[in-house]
Each structure stands twice: as C-alpha cells, then as structure tokens.
C-alpha cells in the first residue's frame, strides 16, 4: 500500500501567492514553514523576480522562500532563483525527468515537484522523479489548470 512507502514526516505548511508587504508581514506573524512566490504569468498571483526580491527582504529568515514555476525555461528558473534569492524551486507544470535532471545540474537549490493526482498510479510514478519533495495536487480535467485547486 502506498501509505507504507511514505516516510513519516511532520506536516509542513506553505502559504502561497505572496504579492504584498502585508502578505509577508502576516507570514512573519504566523510562521509557516515556507511561503511561495508565483512566477507563472497566467496566474492572478504572478510576481516578477524584482517584486519577489523586494518582498523577500522583509521575510523572516527562518521561513523558506519558494519560487513556483510552470513550464518555464531552465535559464529563467535559475535566473529568478538567484535574483530573489530563493531557497526552493517548485515545479508545478509538465516538467519531466530530463528537465529536472538538467535543472539540478544548474542549481544547488532544493527542487520540489507538484503533481496532479487522479489515482495511486500517479503517486507511484511521481515517487520516481529526482526531486527533494513531492506536493500532491488535485487532478482537474482543465488542460492548462496548474494549482489553485
């Protein structure tokens, strides 16, 4: 059973979609494990690398800074990851093993991958990806729906 294969870990909390100074102030108050900046231009919570860098300067250093990317070029991901700078790169699109391996050669940042889960087969396949952490997201039939479910 899949539950037996998952290592016991404590629950982690990430607040995603940080866009305003007030968002960062609230995060500093409630102390999640991580916050996320969305670097997907089709998202209503999109921020630029410059905006994220300015916000991140006020973030409590104990809180991980995560950049969320959807089908972005490796060059752009590493550029933004270094500009902010991010602690973690989260891939939330259709990135495959080859993409992840190439990205890993370009950065020392932790890499997380969000996968849309329809059934346990999706989880088993995702466990084979060369990433540091997996995030399980609700499956949706909408073709270009990434996150926000």
Regions found by a protein language model. Give the residues of each.
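Conserved N-terminal beta1-alpha1 strand-loop-helix module at the mouth
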Residues: 1-149
């Amino acid at each position: 059973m899949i539950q037996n294969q998952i290592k016991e870990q404590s629950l982690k909390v990430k607040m995603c979609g940080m866009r305003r100074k007030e968002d960062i102030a609230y995060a500093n108050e409630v102390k999640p494990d991580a916050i996320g900046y969305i670097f997907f231009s089709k998202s209503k919570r999109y921020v630029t690398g410059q905006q994220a860098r300015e916000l991140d300067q006020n973030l409590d250093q104990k809180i991980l800074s995560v950049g969320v990317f959807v089908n972005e070029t490796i060059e752009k991901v590493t550029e933004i990851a270094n500009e902010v700078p991010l602690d973690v790169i989260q891939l939330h699109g259709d990135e495959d093993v080859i993409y992840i391996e190439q990205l890993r050669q370009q950065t020392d940042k932790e890499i997380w991958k969000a996968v849309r889960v329809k059934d346990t087969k999706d989880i088993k396949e995702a466990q084979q990806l060369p990433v540091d952490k997996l995030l399980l997201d609700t499956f949706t039939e909408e073709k270009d729906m990434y996150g926000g479910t």
